Amino acid sequence: MRGTVYKSTGSWYAVLGQDGQMHECRIKGKFRVQGIKSTNPVAVGDLVQFELEQSGDNPHGVIFDIVERRNYMIRKSVNLSKQTQIIAANIDQALLLITLNNPPTLTPFIDRFLVTAEAYDIPVILVFNKIDCYSAEERFEVDYLLSLYRTIGYTCLLVSALTGTGVDDLKQMMEGKTSLVSGHSGVGKSTLINT
């Protein structure tokens, strides 16, 4: 059966099968994707082939093939090895959530993200979140960053999950697209997704 990986925990994967059901799956034996030294060969967004197996009372799937990826986005493994981590595959766009404080997102982080996305031909939307929390000085800094990144061709959006500012525009930009939502812990990814 064919399906799409929706969640990866490292050894188990939630796969939405073509039957419309979510299946818990694992990979079969030593699984390698040609040309990529990765900490985990299966990524969220991958189209996979899997077989259902019965093991006691818990049926599960076994992934035996990954359909060729349209694209993917990686990051270096945090343990300083030469391996990479595929963070998403087959995506239409990436959204980078940015906050000036709680937590701060620094421009080198933004720039590294943009370079990585450009390397894999993935369009990026910069989403400046928590705009309801900024002082006049911080708002000036946001305006500077907006001007900077818009000038070099990036779509930028101001949002606040708390007040709803910009949320409808964000939903419209995501409509019908497979989007990677990224950013530091605490920038509001889950809050915005659940809004």
Which residue stretches match the model-derived regions?
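Conserved beta-strand/loop subsegment of P-loop NTPase cores
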Residues: N90-I98, D121-I131, R150-V159
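Histidine-anchored nucleotide/phosphate-binding helix
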Residues: P108-P123
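Walker A/P-loop
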Residues: S185, S190-T191, T195
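Short histidine/acidic/glycine/proline-rich micro-motifs that form metal-
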Residues: L100-P103, I131-S135
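N-terminal accessory targeting/assembly segments
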Residues: M1-T107
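Canonical P-loop GTPase G-domain recognition
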Residues: C133-V187
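Residue-level signal for inorganic ion chemistry
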Residues: G45, A117, N129
